[in-house]
Amino acid sequence: MVKSVANEDKTTITSTSKTATSLPSAQPLGATSVPNLIPNRLAVIGKGMRNNNALLANVLQADIQRWYPWSKLQHRFNSNFKKPHAFIGWGHKKSYQRAKKAANRQNIATLSIEDGFLRSIDSGISSRYGLSVVVDDIGIYFDLWRSSRLEELIIKRVEQSSSTDRLILDKQRAQQLMARICTERLSKYNAVIDCPSLDDLIDAGKNDKIAAAKQIDRKSPKSHVLLIDQVVGDASIKGAGADKRQFKRMLKAACQAHPDAHIWIKAHPAAKAGYLTRLTLPENVRILTQALNPIALLAQVNDVYTVSSHMGFEALMLGKAVHCFGVNWYSGWGLSDDSGAPKRLLKTVKKRRQVSAASLETLFYSAYIDYSRYVDPATKQACTIDSAINWLVTNRYWQTCLAGDLTVYEFSRWKLPFVKAFIDLPRTTLFIKPKPRLKNLLHLDHFRVNYQQPLLVWGLAKRQQVQKKLSGKLSKQSSAIPTIFCMEDGFIRSNGLGATLLAPLSVVIDQQGIYYNATQPSDLETLLYNCKTLSAQQITRVQALQTKLLTQRVSKYNVGNRISSNSYDNSDTLKSTGNQPISWVEAAKKSGKLRLLIVGQVEDDLSVQYCGAHIQTNSSLIERVRQDNPDAYLIYKPHPDVEAGLRAGKVTERYLKSVQAIAYNTAMPDCLAGVDEVHTISSLTGFEALLRDLKVVCYGLPFYAGWGLTVDIDAQLLPKSKYLQRRKRKTPLTFEQLLHATLIDYPLYRLPNGYGLAQVEQVIDYLYPGHDERSAEQADDTAKAMPAKASKPSALSTVSVLSAQLKRRATTQFMQKRHQWQQRLRKTSR
């Protein structure tokens, strides 16, 4: 058992502190990196910071070395020892104080590091993979007794608040990001996505002392007021000029200001001692002790009272009235009620700032973009806030969907490593049920399968087999059939065929059915049917993705030769009347006829058998297309697995005479570039053709058909007409919606050596590094089950390259032989 989404312009840091120094720039790590404004050599005292933050060096884009008391001597006697440019410490804790002392002795700067405002899914104790940090060379944002880099950034933005185009764009961007953060319910920690209804809690009488004693009318319309409790000893409380007396004042003020309201105290979810929870509370005050989503909770209240919690700023983003009883980084700018804040500190802060007002967008942009730094755990590279949000949304969704016990049911042994890489999530406990071979039958765990817990199977055939088995087994026990998740290859799979045992970088997991089975609904069909109008950000992302797909020539398997204007493939040429052969692309163009590409498929594949088509063989497809288009120029493209001799679907010479050309070894993007229409039963090539705005004629019902984007042949015949009824939307589906649901929402992506699930754009960048020749390192990493430390392609030896090629060739030959024996056995059984 295995337990278990453009670069931002950063405001340049110019220190005003006596102890801080101007920080040199370092080169960004790549196209997705943000400009680095801190030194590239840092030192830390102790091991806690690096151990608790696995991606600290990645987000800071710096080399972090541990500093020992004798490290200064190393610099004297070891010429290879590089002196750090700055020391780093955590907040104002001991690590920072020790780092500051060491930095003063070395006469270099000290930087304070803290968790960012969008930190991770789980709490800091449970997750070492934080997505964001803040770096401060002046102070730290929660200590208002002195200035901080965040305060300086806000002041600078306010002073530059003239109507420049750049600031207008920044304001719009801040509004878009705030809207998305609130819509996705993102906070510092994001393990919980929902919050119980406060009205329902009152109706149920939970934590309701008044109802128990007086039986009052719980359904009376009253407002909700939230008081945010904090952990005793929290450094931000002292930094806000507050103590336990401020919490008492806050409670008293809230009760006096809202005598008829429902007052709630948000306690710390980890059951740590708080200031409010240990007080004697009035009868109309209730405590929320359960883990819940902060944004979902704040959305239900009218007023929020806080001392120094960041939830106060999140309440401002939601348009709530915020009453501060401490001096926060977001208070004193005219956005909050600061009448209860410590007067002396508030006066000092306002005098220091010399700015009386700042907009919400200015505060957000300064804090979340200028001040914060982000890293994507999937790529382990510095990134923008958009990428961090995409990672949080994707990984939280799948961690929630697959939480609990899950049985991986009878997978091939070679698939298990990459299956674990996709679904071995923090809140998922996997049980591996092997195939029923003799050695597995002898294993004690083989018969310990709990058939009442969710199962994960590979492909439609295994799903049907398990459903049939469980219907008989559980009917005797009067138990419902458990959830059966169906896993399959994704739409952007790998640089090679799945039949050669090459691990995928993308899979789909479907709870209802599977995308290629038109006989019943699937999760993808449901996504497409319920797809709402895309936001401006989503449309921008989809358009950029479409451009990337076309520019990088992306296809599912990414196999075949690219056609060059100076060369041709002998296997994809036509005999001409002259002495020189010509390529089929050139011949088709010169013919002046309508060019139709017929896409071959694996005939015994379930995507053909369950697509509702009357035509289910490649030969019949060629015959039908020729019959309906007698004057067209036909090009037939065999399926890669059939072409490699691994699967059934070979077309005889009799039917091949009906076509003018056969694209044996031409890459699919080149095939699509040379035709006018695509004719297919249910191939994914039809979707790739829609990307290129080509006319697509479907003889079956693939996932992209039936929405008004394709020509659906035999739509009036059963059973296809029956299946089409499920796809009748009130509003037409746009191609942007189709692309977003199919490539962004539906699949799961991963990268070798990465943590968590990746995004489609990242997988494309990995598979297409910018040159035609793929490095052997990538092919090897993709095929590996367990993550290994990546090395540069240039460092690979010739022996390693040849070894990888021989391994793939041997695997292909083995699969070809196996397919031949399977065909012989089928003929014998007949």
Give residue ranges: language-model regions.
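Catalytic-core helical/loop segments in enzymes performing group transfer/polymerization on anionic/lipid-linked
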Residues: 1-8, 13, 18, 23-830
